[in-house]
Protein backbone atom coordinates (compact mmCIF):
# COMPACT_ATOMS: atom_id res chain seq x y z
CA UNK A 1 0.00 0.00 0.00
CA UNK A 2 1.42 3.36 -1.04
CA UNK A 3 1.83 5.82 1.81
CA UNK A 4 0.85 9.46 1.38
CA UNK A 5 4.42 10.27 2.37
CA UNK A 6 5.72 8.22 -0.56
CA UNK A 7 3.74 10.39 -2.96
CA UNK A 8 5.20 13.47 -1.32
CA UNK A 9 8.73 12.07 -1.57
CA UNK A 10 8.21 11.38 -5.26
CA UNK A 11 7.14 15.00 -5.74
CA UNK A 12 10.20 16.17 -3.81
CA UNK A 13 12.44 13.99 -5.98
CA UNK A 14 11.07 15.58 -9.14
CA UNK A 15 11.48 19.08 -7.73
CA UNK A 16 15.13 18.51 -6.83
CA UNK A 17 15.90 16.88 -10.17
CA UNK A 18 14.40 19.84 -12.05
CA UNK A 19 16.53 22.15 -9.93
CA UNK A 20 19.57 20.14 -10.99
CA UNK A 21 18.62 20.41 -14.64
CA UNK A 22 18.27 24.18 -14.30
CA UNK A 23 21.61 24.41 -12.51
CA UNK A 24 23.32 22.39 -15.22
CA UNK A 25 21.77 24.67 -17.81
CA UNK A 26 23.07 27.76 -16.00
CA UNK A 27 26.60 26.37 -16.00
CA UNK A 28 26.38 25.41 -19.67
CA UNK A 29 25.23 28.92 -20.62
CA UNK A 30 27.98 30.59 -18.58
CA UNK A 31 30.65 28.33 -20.07
CA UNK A 32 29.30 28.91 -23.56
CA UNK A 33 29.58 32.64 -22.99
CA UNK A 34 33.11 32.23 -21.66
CA UNK A 35 34.29 30.15 -24.61
CA UNK A 36 32.52 32.26 -27.24
CA UNK A 37 33.40 35.61 -25.66
CA UNK A 38 29.71 36.45 -25.34
CA UNK A 39 27.98 38.29 -22.51
CA UNK A 40 25.51 35.86 -20.92
CA UNK A 41 25.37 37.66 -17.57
CA UNK A 42 21.66 38.51 -17.59
CA UNK A 43 20.59 35.08 -18.81
CA UNK A 44 22.66 33.32 -16.16
CA UNK A 45 21.49 35.72 -13.45
CA UNK A 46 17.88 34.94 -14.31
CA UNK A 47 18.60 31.21 -14.22
CA UNK A 48 20.39 31.58 -10.88
CA UNK A 49 17.39 33.45 -9.45
CA UNK A 50 15.04 30.73 -10.70
CA UNK A 51 17.17 28.05 -9.05
CA UNK A 52 17.14 30.04 -5.82
CA UNK A 53 13.33 30.17 -5.92
CA UNK A 54 13.21 26.43 -6.61
CA UNK A 55 15.39 25.82 -3.56
CA UNK A 56 12.92 27.71 -1.37
CA UNK A 57 10.05 25.64 -2.80
CA UNK A 58 11.99 22.45 -2.11
CA UNK A 59 12.65 23.49 1.49
CA UNK A 60 8.98 24.33 1.98
CA UNK A 61 7.94 20.97 0.55
CA UNK A 62 10.42 19.17 2.79
CA UNK A 63 9.14 20.91 5.92
CA UNK A 64 5.56 20.21 4.85
CA UNK A 65 6.31 16.48 4.62
CA UNK A 66 7.99 16.48 8.02
CA UNK A 67 5.14 18.33 9.74
CA UNK A 68 2.28 16.43 8.07
CA UNK A 69 3.63 12.88 8.15
CA UNK A 70 6.22 12.78 10.96
CA UNK A 71 8.51 10.53 8.91
CA UNK A 72 10.63 7.79 10.43
CA UNK A 73 14.43 7.97 10.44
CA UNK A 74 14.92 6.43 7.00
CA UNK A 75 12.50 8.89 5.40
CA UNK A 76 14.03 11.81 7.27
CA UNK A 77 17.39 10.75 5.84
CA UNK A 78 16.02 11.07 2.33
CA UNK A 79 14.33 14.42 2.98
CA UNK A 80 17.42 15.91 4.61
CA UNK A 81 19.64 14.67 1.79
CA UNK A 82 17.39 16.23 -0.83
CA UNK A 83 17.57 19.55 0.98
CA UNK A 84 21.37 19.35 0.95
CA UNK A 85 21.38 18.52 -2.76
CA UNK A 86 19.07 21.44 -3.50
CA UNK A 87 21.49 23.77 -1.71
CA UNK A 88 24.41 22.43 -3.77
CA UNK A 89 22.46 22.91 -7.00
CA UNK A 90 21.80 26.48 -5.91
CA UNK A 91 25.57 26.91 -5.53
CA UNK A 92 26.05 25.59 -9.07
CA UNK A 93 23.81 28.41 -10.27
CA UNK A 94 25.55 31.01 -8.16
CA UNK A 95 29.01 30.05 -9.40
CA UNK A 96 27.71 30.03 -12.97
CA UNK A 97 26.64 33.64 -12.46
CA UNK A 98 30.00 34.45 -10.86
CA UNK A 99 31.76 33.14 -13.97
CA UNK A 100 29.63 35.26 -16.31
CA UNK A 101 29.85 38.36 -14.11
CA UNK A 102 33.64 38.07 -13.76
CA UNK A 103 34.04 37.63 -17.50
CA UNK A 104 31.86 40.65 -18.21
CA UNK A 105 33.58 42.92 -15.68
CA UNK A 106 37.22 41.93 -16.14
CA UNK A 107 37.59 40.39 -19.57
CA UNK A 108 35.39 42.92 -21.38
CA UNK A 109 33.90 39.99 -23.30
CA UNK A 110 35.90 40.12 -26.53
CA UNK A 111 39.40 40.54 -25.16
CA UNK A 112 40.11 37.30 -23.30
CA UNK A 113 39.45 34.14 -25.25
CA UNK A 114 40.13 30.89 -23.37
CA UNK A 115 43.08 29.20 -25.05
CA UNK A 116 44.94 27.36 -22.29
CA UNK A 117 44.78 23.58 -22.58
CA UNK A 118 44.68 23.37 -18.79
CA UNK A 119 41.64 25.65 -18.57
CA UNK A 120 39.87 23.80 -21.37
CA UNK A 121 40.49 20.48 -19.62
CA UNK A 122 39.27 21.98 -16.36
CA UNK A 123 36.07 23.13 -18.05
CA UNK A 124 35.55 19.71 -19.63
CA UNK A 125 36.05 17.86 -16.34
CA UNK A 126 33.79 20.13 -14.31
CA UNK A 127 30.91 20.24 -16.80
CA UNK A 128 31.13 16.46 -17.02
CA UNK A 129 30.89 16.20 -13.24
CA UNK A 130 27.85 18.46 -13.19
CA UNK A 131 26.08 16.35 -15.79
CA UNK A 132 27.05 13.16 -13.98
CA UNK A 133 25.76 14.44 -10.63
CA UNK A 134 22.36 15.23 -12.12
CA UNK A 135 22.23 11.87 -13.92
CA UNK A 136 23.18 10.01 -10.73
CA UNK A 137 20.37 11.79 -8.88
CA UNK A 138 17.81 10.89 -11.53
CA UNK A 139 18.78 7.23 -11.38
CA UNK A 140 19.64 7.11 -7.65
CA UNK A 141 22.88 5.54 -8.89
CA UNK A 142 25.29 5.28 -5.97
CA UNK A 143 28.10 3.80 -8.06
CA UNK A 144 27.92 6.61 -10.60
CA UNK A 145 27.88 9.14 -7.77
CA UNK A 146 31.00 7.59 -6.25
CA UNK A 147 32.98 8.17 -9.45
CA UNK A 148 32.76 11.91 -8.81
CA UNK A 149 35.44 11.60 -6.14
CA UNK A 150 38.21 10.52 -8.50
CA UNK A 151 37.28 13.16 -11.05
CA UNK A 152 37.34 15.83 -8.35
CA UNK A 153 40.94 14.88 -7.57
CA UNK A 154 41.78 15.32 -11.26
CA UNK A 155 40.12 18.74 -11.18
CA UNK A 156 42.25 19.74 -8.19
CA UNK A 157 45.40 18.71 -10.04
CA UNK A 158 44.40 20.74 -13.09
CA UNK A 159 43.45 23.72 -10.95
CA UNK A 160 46.77 23.84 -9.10
CA UNK A 161 48.69 23.30 -12.34
CA UNK A 162 46.80 26.21 -13.87
CA UNK A 163 47.47 28.40 -10.83
CA UNK A 164 51.15 27.59 -11.16
CA UNK A 165 51.05 28.58 -14.82
CA UNK A 166 49.30 31.87 -14.08
CA UNK A 167 51.76 32.69 -11.30
CA UNK A 168 54.56 32.57 -13.85
CA UNK A 169 52.80 34.77 -16.39
CA UNK A 170 54.65 38.00 -17.05
CA UNK A 171 51.47 39.92 -17.61
CA UNK A 172 49.19 40.43 -14.61
CA UNK A 173 46.39 42.07 -16.58
CA UNK A 174 42.65 41.68 -16.22
CA UNK A 175 42.62 38.57 -18.38
CA UNK A 176 44.89 36.80 -15.91
CA UNK A 177 42.67 37.96 -13.03
CA UNK A 178 39.58 36.76 -14.87
CA UNK A 179 41.07 33.34 -15.62
CA UNK A 180 42.25 32.99 -12.04
CA UNK A 181 38.80 33.67 -10.62
CA UNK A 182 36.98 31.52 -13.18
CA UNK A 183 39.28 28.57 -12.48
CA UNK A 184 38.51 28.94 -8.78
CA UNK A 185 34.76 28.99 -9.42
CA UNK A 186 35.09 25.84 -11.52
CA UNK A 187 37.04 24.13 -8.75
CA UNK A 188 34.32 25.03 -6.25
CA UNK A 189 31.60 23.69 -8.54
CA UNK A 190 33.52 20.41 -8.66
CA UNK A 191 33.57 20.34 -4.85
CA UNK A 192 29.81 20.77 -4.74
CA UNK A 193 29.29 17.90 -7.20
CA UNK A 194 31.01 15.62 -4.68
CA UNK A 195 28.66 16.86 -1.95
CA UNK A 196 25.76 15.95 -4.23
CA UNK A 197 27.37 12.57 -4.84
CA UNK A 198 27.73 11.92 -1.11
CA UNK A 199 24.06 12.74 -0.55
CA UNK A 200 22.98 10.47 -3.42
CA UNK A 201 24.96 7.57 -1.96
CA UNK A 202 23.32 8.19 1.41
CA UNK A 203 19.84 8.26 -0.14
CA UNK A 204 20.44 5.08 -2.13
CA UNK A 205 22.33 2.98 0.42
CA UNK A 206 22.29 4.66 3.82
CA UNK A 207 26.10 4.75 3.66
CA UNK A 208 27.92 7.90 4.73
CA UNK A 209 31.00 8.53 2.61
CA UNK A 210 33.37 11.38 1.80
CA UNK A 211 34.27 11.80 -1.87
CA UNK A 212 36.69 14.71 -1.64
Q: Which sequence ranges carry the predicted segments?
A:
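Cytosolic, long alpha-helical scaffolding segments
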Residues: 1-212
